[in-house]
Protein backbone atom coordinates (compact mmCIF):
# COMPACT_ATOMS: atom_id res chain seq x y z
CA UNK A 1 0.00 0.00 0.00
CA UNK A 2 1.32 3.46 -0.95
CA UNK A 3 -0.20 6.74 0.22
CA UNK A 4 0.98 9.84 -1.68
CA UNK A 5 0.14 13.33 -2.93
CA UNK A 6 -0.17 13.72 -6.71
CA UNK A 7 0.84 16.64 -8.91
CA UNK A 8 -2.47 18.42 -8.29
CA UNK A 9 -1.97 18.29 -4.52
CA UNK A 10 -4.62 15.59 -4.04
CA UNK A 11 -4.16 12.38 -2.08
CA UNK A 12 -3.81 9.00 -3.80
CA UNK A 13 -3.85 5.52 -2.31
CA UNK A 14 -2.25 2.71 -4.36
CA UNK A 15 -3.41 -0.62 -2.97
CA UNK A 16 -2.36 -4.09 -4.16
CA UNK A 17 -4.69 -6.84 -2.96
CA UNK A 18 -6.57 -10.04 -3.70
CA UNK A 19 -9.40 -12.06 -2.18
CA UNK A 20 -9.44 -15.50 -0.64
CA UNK A 21 -11.03 -18.43 -2.43
CA UNK A 22 -13.32 -17.48 -5.32
CA UNK A 23 -14.84 -14.39 -3.74
CA UNK A 24 -14.97 -11.16 -5.76
CA UNK A 25 -15.34 -7.72 -4.20
CA UNK A 26 -16.43 -4.58 -6.09
CA UNK A 27 -13.80 -1.85 -5.90
CA UNK A 28 -16.51 0.73 -5.17
CA UNK A 29 -17.47 -1.08 -1.97
CA UNK A 30 -13.90 -0.66 -0.70
CA UNK A 31 -13.90 3.09 -1.36
CA UNK A 32 -16.30 3.82 1.52
CA UNK A 33 -14.25 1.78 3.99
CA UNK A 34 -11.00 3.42 2.92
CA UNK A 35 -12.61 6.88 3.11
CA UNK A 36 -13.66 6.22 6.71
CA UNK A 37 -10.18 4.99 7.61
CA UNK A 38 -8.31 7.90 6.01
CA UNK A 39 -10.79 10.67 6.80
CA UNK A 40 -10.87 11.68 3.12
CA UNK A 41 -13.36 10.94 0.37
CA UNK A 42 -11.59 8.44 -1.89
CA UNK A 43 -12.92 7.25 -5.24
CA UNK A 44 -11.49 4.47 -7.43
CA UNK A 45 -9.70 5.46 -10.62
CA UNK A 46 -11.66 4.82 -13.81
CA UNK A 47 -8.71 3.18 -15.51
CA UNK A 48 -8.31 0.34 -13.00
CA UNK A 49 -10.08 -2.94 -12.29
CA UNK A 50 -13.66 -2.80 -11.07
CA UNK A 51 -13.57 -6.15 -9.26
CA UNK A 52 -10.98 -7.67 -6.93
CA UNK A 53 -10.52 -11.42 -7.42
CA UNK A 54 -8.04 -14.09 -6.39
CA UNK A 55 -5.21 -12.62 -8.47
CA UNK A 56 -3.24 -9.71 -7.06
CA UNK A 57 -4.51 -6.42 -8.49
CA UNK A 58 -3.32 -2.86 -7.91
CA UNK A 59 -6.09 -0.29 -7.61
CA UNK A 60 -5.61 3.47 -7.37
CA UNK A 61 -7.98 5.45 -5.15
CA UNK A 62 -7.93 9.23 -5.57
CA UNK A 63 -9.20 11.98 -3.32
CA UNK A 64 -12.63 12.98 -4.63
CA UNK A 65 -14.33 16.39 -4.57
CA UNK A 66 -16.13 17.53 -1.44
CA UNK A 67 -18.80 19.38 -3.42
CA UNK A 68 -20.89 18.95 -6.55
CA UNK A 69 -22.97 21.32 -8.63
CA UNK A 70 -26.53 21.16 -9.92
CA UNK A 71 -27.52 23.35 -12.85
CA UNK A 72 -30.67 24.69 -14.44
CA UNK A 73 -31.14 26.75 -17.60
CA UNK A 74 -33.93 28.85 -19.08
CA UNK A 75 -33.68 30.88 -22.27
CA UNK A 76 -35.83 32.78 -24.73
CA UNK A 77 -35.10 35.09 -27.66
CA UNK A 78 -35.86 38.80 -27.83
CA UNK A 79 -39.58 39.44 -28.27
CA UNK A 80 -40.27 35.81 -27.28
CA UNK A 81 -38.45 34.60 -30.40
CA UNK A 82 -37.30 30.99 -30.55
CA UNK A 83 -33.80 32.17 -31.52
CA UNK A 84 -31.69 33.55 -28.69
CA UNK A 85 -28.51 35.55 -29.20
CA UNK A 86 -27.08 34.00 -26.04
CA UNK A 87 -25.01 30.82 -25.81
CA UNK A 88 -23.72 28.84 -22.85
CA UNK A 89 -21.60 25.89 -21.88
CA UNK A 90 -20.85 23.76 -18.83
CA UNK A 91 -17.57 21.90 -18.71
CA UNK A 92 -15.35 19.88 -16.41
CA UNK A 93 -11.92 21.47 -15.99
CA UNK A 94 -8.61 20.05 -14.73
CA UNK A 95 -8.00 19.91 -11.00
CA UNK A 96 -11.55 19.07 -9.99
CA UNK A 97 -13.09 22.29 -11.24
CA UNK A 98 -16.35 22.98 -13.04
CA UNK A 99 -16.85 25.87 -15.44
CA UNK A 100 -20.08 27.57 -16.50
CA UNK A 101 -19.97 30.25 -19.19
CA UNK A 102 -22.48 32.59 -20.85
CA UNK A 103 -21.96 34.74 -23.91
CA UNK A 104 -24.29 37.43 -25.24
CA UNK A 105 -23.68 38.25 -28.90
CA UNK A 106 -24.06 41.72 -30.38
CA UNK A 107 -27.60 42.42 -31.58
CA UNK A 108 -30.24 39.71 -31.65
CA UNK A 109 -31.40 36.71 -33.62
CA UNK A 110 -29.25 34.51 -35.85
CA UNK A 111 -26.32 36.94 -36.14
CA UNK A 112 -25.99 37.32 -32.37
CA UNK A 113 -26.38 33.58 -31.94
CA UNK A 114 -23.51 32.91 -34.36
CA UNK A 115 -21.24 35.37 -32.54
CA UNK A 116 -21.93 34.02 -29.07
CA UNK A 117 -21.67 30.41 -30.28
CA UNK A 118 -18.25 31.14 -31.80
CA UNK A 119 -17.05 32.67 -28.53
CA UNK A 120 -18.27 29.73 -26.46
CA UNK A 121 -16.71 27.18 -28.82
CA UNK A 122 -13.35 28.98 -28.72
CA UNK A 123 -13.52 29.20 -24.94
CA UNK A 124 -14.22 25.47 -24.64
CA UNK A 125 -11.31 24.58 -26.90
CA UNK A 126 -8.83 26.80 -25.07
CA UNK A 127 -9.86 25.72 -21.58
CA UNK A 128 -9.83 22.05 -22.54
CA UNK A 129 -6.32 22.60 -23.95
CA UNK A 130 -5.23 23.78 -20.49
CA UNK A 131 -5.02 27.55 -20.93
CA UNK A 132 -5.82 29.64 -17.81
CA UNK A 133 -9.27 31.23 -17.93
CA UNK A 134 -8.17 34.85 -18.29
CA UNK A 135 -5.53 33.97 -20.86
CA UNK A 136 -8.15 32.15 -22.90
CA UNK A 137 -10.45 35.18 -22.84
CA UNK A 138 -7.60 37.48 -23.88
CA UNK A 139 -6.79 35.17 -26.79
CA UNK A 140 -10.40 35.16 -27.97
CA UNK A 141 -10.48 38.95 -27.77
CA UNK A 142 -7.36 39.21 -29.92
CA UNK A 143 -8.89 36.83 -32.46
CA UNK A 144 -12.08 38.89 -32.73
CA UNK A 145 -10.33 42.27 -32.89
CA UNK A 146 -7.54 41.40 -35.33
CA UNK A 147 -9.40 39.00 -37.57
CA UNK A 148 -12.19 41.35 -38.72
CA UNK A 149 -12.66 44.80 -40.20
CA UNK A 150 -16.02 45.42 -38.51
CA UNK A 151 -16.57 45.36 -34.76
CA UNK A 152 -18.48 42.30 -33.56
CA UNK A 153 -18.48 42.19 -29.80
CA UNK A 154 -19.73 39.58 -27.34
CA UNK A 155 -19.77 39.32 -23.59
CA UNK A 156 -18.19 36.54 -21.58
CA UNK A 157 -19.45 35.58 -18.14
CA UNK A 158 -17.46 32.68 -16.71
CA UNK A 159 -17.80 31.13 -13.27
CA UNK A 160 -15.29 28.48 -12.20
CA UNK A 161 -16.20 26.28 -9.24
CA UNK A 162 -13.50 24.46 -7.27
CA UNK A 163 -15.28 21.29 -6.17
CA UNK A 164 -12.59 20.52 -3.59
CA UNK A 165 -12.53 23.84 -1.71
CA UNK A 166 -15.98 25.28 -2.43
CA UNK A 167 -14.46 28.47 -3.80
CA UNK A 168 -15.71 30.02 -7.02
CA UNK A 169 -14.16 32.65 -9.27
CA UNK A 170 -16.40 34.94 -11.30
CA UNK A 171 -14.72 36.28 -14.43
CA UNK A 172 -16.50 38.91 -16.54
CA UNK A 173 -15.87 40.78 -19.78
CA UNK A 174 -18.81 43.10 -20.40
CA UNK A 175 -21.14 40.65 -18.72
CA UNK A 176 -24.32 41.29 -16.79
CA UNK A 177 -24.80 40.96 -13.04
CA UNK A 178 -24.46 37.75 -11.06
CA UNK A 179 -26.50 37.08 -7.94
CA UNK A 180 -25.37 34.76 -5.13
CA UNK A 181 -28.10 33.51 -2.80
CA UNK A 182 -27.08 32.24 0.62
CA UNK A 183 -30.12 31.32 2.71
CA UNK A 184 -31.83 34.71 3.24
CA UNK A 185 -29.00 36.85 1.86
CA UNK A 186 -28.46 38.01 -1.72
CA UNK A 187 -25.10 39.29 -2.98
CA UNK A 188 -25.14 41.30 -6.20
CA UNK A 189 -21.92 41.30 -8.25
CA UNK A 190 -21.46 43.67 -11.20
CA UNK A 191 -18.83 44.37 -13.85
CA UNK A 192 -17.62 47.55 -15.55
CA UNK A 193 -15.39 45.88 -18.13
CA UNK A 194 -15.96 46.06 -21.89
CA UNK A 195 -17.09 43.07 -23.99
CA UNK A 196 -14.53 41.19 -26.04
CA UNK A 197 -14.00 42.19 -29.66
CA UNK A 198 -14.00 45.96 -29.04
CA UNK A 199 -10.38 46.88 -28.23
CA UNK A 200 -6.99 45.19 -28.36
CA UNK A 201 -6.43 45.94 -24.69
CA UNK A 202 -8.99 44.12 -22.58
CA UNK A 203 -9.60 44.54 -18.86
CA UNK A 204 -11.20 41.53 -17.24
CA UNK A 205 -13.09 41.77 -13.96
CA UNK A 206 -12.55 38.91 -11.54
CA UNK A 207 -13.63 38.18 -7.99
CA UNK A 208 -13.56 35.09 -5.77
CA UNK A 209 -16.19 33.95 -3.29
CA UNK A 210 -16.36 31.07 -0.82
CA UNK A 211 -19.52 29.02 -1.22
CA UNK A 212 -21.23 26.64 1.18
CA UNK A 213 -23.73 23.84 0.82
CA UNK A 214 -27.00 25.09 -0.69
CA UNK A 215 -25.61 28.31 -2.18
CA UNK A 216 -27.08 29.42 -5.51
CA UNK A 217 -25.05 31.29 -8.14
CA UNK A 218 -27.43 32.92 -10.62
CA UNK A 219 -25.91 34.06 -13.91
CA UNK A 220 -27.90 35.91 -16.55
CA UNK A 221 -27.58 38.10 -19.62
CA UNK A 222 -28.71 41.71 -20.08
CA UNK A 223 -32.04 40.75 -21.60
CA UNK A 224 -33.38 39.59 -18.23
CA UNK A 225 -32.61 42.90 -16.52
CA UNK A 226 -33.73 44.93 -19.55
CA UNK A 227 -37.20 43.42 -19.23
CA UNK A 228 -37.60 45.15 -15.84
CA UNK A 229 -38.33 48.87 -15.21
CA UNK A 230 -35.26 51.09 -15.56
CA UNK A 231 -33.82 52.12 -12.21
CA UNK A 232 -35.44 49.23 -10.34
CA UNK A 233 -33.94 46.29 -12.19
CA UNK A 234 -31.42 45.08 -9.61
CA UNK A 235 -33.79 45.59 -6.68
CA UNK A 236 -36.67 43.79 -8.40
CA UNK A 237 -34.54 40.85 -9.45
CA UNK A 238 -33.10 40.51 -5.95
CA UNK A 239 -36.67 40.53 -4.63
CA UNK A 240 -37.71 37.82 -7.10
CA UNK A 241 -34.76 35.62 -6.17
CA UNK A 242 -35.07 36.15 -2.42
CA UNK A 243 -38.85 35.78 -2.36
CA UNK A 244 -39.13 32.32 -3.89
CA UNK A 245 -39.01 28.99 -2.06
CA UNK A 246 -38.02 27.13 -5.23
CA UNK A 247 -34.97 24.92 -4.69
CA UNK A 248 -34.70 23.06 -7.99
CA UNK A 249 -32.20 24.98 -10.20
CA UNK A 250 -34.11 24.39 -13.44
CA UNK A 251 -37.41 25.50 -11.94
CA UNK A 252 -35.70 28.53 -10.37
CA UNK A 253 -34.28 29.56 -13.76
CA UNK A 254 -37.72 29.31 -15.34
CA UNK A 255 -39.25 31.28 -12.47
CA UNK A 256 -36.77 34.14 -12.90
CA UNK A 257 -37.24 34.23 -16.68
Regions found by a protein language model. Give the residues of each.
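Acidic loop->beta-strand submotif enriched in PP2C/PPM serine/threonine phosphatases
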Residues: 81-97, 156, 188-229
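Catalytic core of PPM/PP2C metal-dependent serine/threonine phosphatase domains
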Residues: 5-11, 29-52, 56, 64, ...
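N-terminal loops that bind phosphate or other acidic moieties
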Residues: 15, 91, 131
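Active-site-proximal, acidic helix/loop segment immediately C-terminal to a metal-coordinating Asp/Glu
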Residues: 105-129, 211, 215-257
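PP2C/PPM-type serine/threonine phosphatase catalytic core
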Residues: 169-198, 205-207, 213, 234, ...
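N-terminal entry segment of metal-dependent catalytic domains or homologous docking segments
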Residues: 50-105, 111
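A short interface-forming secondary-structure element
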Residues: 15-23
